[in-house]
Every structure is written in structure tokens, then in C-alpha cells.
Amino acid sequence: MQRQLIEGRAALIVIDIQAGAFVEKDERSIPHMPDYAERMALAKTAIDGARASGIPVIFIQEVHRPDLVDFGRELDGDEDVHCLEDNPETAIAVEQTGFTPRDYLIKKRRYSAFFGTDFEILLRGLRVDTLLLCGGLTDVCVHYTFVDGHQSDYFCRVIEDCVAGSSIEAHEAALRAMEYLQTGARRSLDEVMTAMKAHAP
């Protein structure tokens, strides 16, 4: 059954668009598909649109302690040490997103924004029904946040122009997996902008 793009109240969830995504490097601690930075920068259009429509914007930031004590099993796969508290590249990408200290910010230690955070308390306080997801990685933090949102009975949408994965193949597979859970989950930026404008006060 396909629902409306926005059911009830929406929030834009900006996942892990952090300063390091916009630093040119030969090697990265986490693999990125081509055009990763460009896709992250495009999220600013969605952020501006949400603000103009009165839709709350919630930034998610992955951050780890410098002694690595909270990584758990996260380093057992393809990822190397990343997002340390004392690294400037871990900060939210202020210039590219327009983030301000007045914005909602959830810091997480795991892939899902729901796991071990007060994200759901914030969503309940805002009376949110629909999560509009952008950021990265499509196949990791976006996917797992989507799944936990789905299992918590939120309507979940992923803005496919504004997410990027560890590879093109992983990105596409994650988008298909999310669409499997909720028909109509994959949405273009243009579609989301139109829906947000329709919900403006």
C-alpha cells in the first residue's frame, strides 16, 4: 500500500553530513561512492525547503571518543577509525548545511540515530509522523535509521538525490531494501520539495 509522501507531521533528518565529507583526500577511513560530496551539498536545498515550510530539521552527528571505547564491533568491517571527538572533520558541515546552534542535534555512537540516543523522545515531542531522510551513508546510517524508524511505525522517506553510499552498488541495494519496507519510500528531491511546500503554513 502506497501512502502520501508526507503523512501527518514531517521532520527532515540530516544524517552525518559532517565536515570530513568535503575534505579532498586520496584515502578515507570510510569508502565513498563517486559524487558523495556533491550529493551531501544538495541536501542544503532540502534543508532550506524544510525551514521555509515550517518543518523541523534534525541533524544527526556520529561521534566517537578518542580512546575508541565506544566503537564496539564497528571496526570489524570495512571502516577504519572515524568521527573522533577531537577531530575538526567530525563537526557538522556548517557552511554546506547552514547548521546553527539553534538547530536540533542528536549525537550518536552507532549507525542508527535511534540507538542509544534521545532521538525518539525528540520526535515524540515534535509529534512527527513522517521522517524525510538525507545524508550518508545510504547503505549504513541512513538505512539503519530508516529500518528503526519503520519498526517504530514512522512513515519513512529517503531523498535519493541527497544520499550517497559506500559504493554505487551498495547505495542502490540499500535504496531497494528501503523501498521494499515501505512502498514509495524512494523519492526525488523535486518530489519532496513539492510535498514540503504543500505542508507550509
Language-model segment annotations:
Residues 38-56:
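A short, N-terminal amphipathic alpha-helix
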Residues 20-25, 67-69:
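Short acidic/His/Gly/Ser-rich catalytic and metal-binding motifs that mark active-site loops
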Residues 27-36, 76-82:
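Short glycine-enriched, charge-decorated loop/helix-capping segments at active-site entrances
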Residues 65-75:
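Acidic, proline/glycine-rich short linear motifs
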Residues 15, 55-62:
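Short beta-strand segments at enzyme active-site cores
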Residues 11-21:
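Acidic-leg catalytic submotif of subtilisin-like serine proteases
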Residues 16-18, 63-64, 88, 111-112:
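Short glycine-enriched loops at secondary-structure junctions
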Residues 1-11, 48-53, 77-201:
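Active-site-adjacent betaalpha module
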